[in-house]
Curated annotation (Swiss-Prot):
Induction: Repressed by SinR. May be involved in the production of the exopolysaccharide (EPS) component of the extracellular matrix during biofilm formation. EPS is responsible for the adhesion of chains of cells into bundles. Required for biofilm maintenance. The gene is epsD. Belongs to the glycosyltransferase group 1 family. Glycosyltransferase 4 subfamily. It comes from the Bacteria. The keyword NADP does not apply. Its EC number is 2.4.-.-. The keyword Thylakoid does not apply. This is Putative glycosyltransferase EpsD. InterPro entries: Glyco_trans_1, Glyco_trans_4-like_N, Glycosyltransferase_grp1.
């Protein structure tokens, strides 16, 4: 009988963006791959896809019906492994798999960044920490992507459960690679930028946590010192109008580009001079790693995810959250020192290779194998 795995997350785009290599790996192993998530995105390597309207808010009453749908799917298909991602998807899937787990289904959860962390609001600790502590009883393996979360997870895990740390979800270092000056210029022309523009790129959803406000304020401080500065936001989100209004208010509209969704994000990164990130909370910082893979120097806010990949002054710079002036100073420093840009970029590429897709697939294969090689299902309490 063919073995089956169910991947669950809040939205299906999460899988398209980050998990296709793992789907492919399971197919190569002869497994059936099923997906449960909100959305209509077509996903390769998937045998069954369940469009389940999981809500992002843990307080949305519709998630009760979602729980019932998920439980029906899990109980019907008798999965060997259920691997869940994202906070709400992870909660609902683990609750829905409790009965199946008693019959041998193994449940894995990847925390892409706990909402409770150093510096997080007290409400995050009061809400998310007790829930994760409770759910650890229904989790066979808790997987983390940064050191702070790994240490925290070891304190959460119940006897019999495993805690693992991997090098993120994997950067495609072939797609995100350095390009020649000629190719960079071609990409700039293709995407509507000038040859002499000094381009900073930040691919991220426009929201409060990604904190684009700090970058806009930094750009406003540099608008006269670096007239060719272009700060490019690749993404959409609820804060787009607010951030556009802020750029206008600070007189920086000519220097801030709201690019919107970009299907060729690797090209937007390759045409840039510097990779930037201003998030308050980050699990790892894939956008920073993608910039590093393309040999872009990185400037990012000092949080647990960015600290995992940036060594201040060696492969990039870390900036205190909220300190727009410090961000501006580092941008200006790189503008005036192209040799420093090259040095940081080369070191960044070395860092990105340690977080490559090939390495993380290998790490996850080791984790999965512990549950795939069982001849008979071992029942969980």
């Amino acid at each position: 009988m063919t073995k089956k795995i169910l991947f669950c997350a809040t939205v299906d785009y999460h899988f398209k963006a980050f998990h296709l290599p793992y789907f492919k790996w399971f197919k190569q192993m002869g497994w059936e791959v099923h997906v449960a998530a909100n959305g209509q995105t077509k996903l390769p390597y998937v045998d069954e896809k369940f469009s389940i309207p999981i809500r992002r808010s843990p307080f949305d009453p519709q998630n009760l019906a979602v729980y019932r749908q998920l439980k029906k799917v899990i109980d019907t298909y008798e999965y060997d492994i259920v691997h869940c991602h994202t906070p709400v998807g992870g909660v609902l899937a683990r609750l829905a798999a409790r009965q199946a787990r008693r019959h041998g289904t193994k449940v894995l959860y990847t925390a892409h960044g706990f909402h409770f962390c150093k510096g997080a609001p007290m409400k995050n600790w009061l809400l998310y920490y007790p829930v994760e502590k409770w759910l650890s009883a229904y989790t066979d393996c808790l997987i983390t992507i940064n050191e702070e979360d790994y240490i925290r997870a070891k304190g959460l895990q119940r006897p019999g459960g495993r805690t693992q740390k991997i090098h993120g979800i994997g950067v495609n270092t072939e797609r995100f690679r350095p390009v020649s000056p000629i190719e960079q210029q071609r990409l700039r022309e293709k995407h509507g930028f000038r040859e002499d523009d000094f381009i900073l790129v930040y691919p991220a959803e426009l929201n409060l946590n990604k904190n684009q406000k700090q970058l806009i304020e930094a750009a406003a401080l540099l608008k006269e010192k670096i007239p060719s500065l272009r700060l490019v936001f690749a993404g959409e989100g609820a804060m787009e109008h607010t951030y556009q209004t802020l750029a206008e208010k600070l007189g920086a509209s000519a220097h801030v580009c709201f690019y919107g969704f970009c299907s060729d994000i690797h090209e937007l990164i390759q045409l840039a001079d510097v990779s930037v990130a201003s998030s308050i909370r980050e699990g790892l910082g894939m956008n920073v790693l993608e910039g590093m893979a393309a040999e872009q120097p990185a400037i990012a806010t000092d949080n647990r995810g960015h600290r995992e990949i940036i060594r201040d002054g060696e492969n990039g710079f870390l900036i205190k959250i909220g300190d727009s002036a410090a961000f501006a100073r580092r941008i200006e420093q790189l503008y005036h020192k192209p040799e420093l840009c090259r040095k940081l970029g080369q070191e960044g590429r070395k860092t990105a290779l340690r977080f490559s897709e090939a390495r993380t697939v290998e790490e996850m294969a080791d984790i999965y194998s512990a549950y795939m090689d069982m001849d008979t299902k071992e029942k969980s309490v």
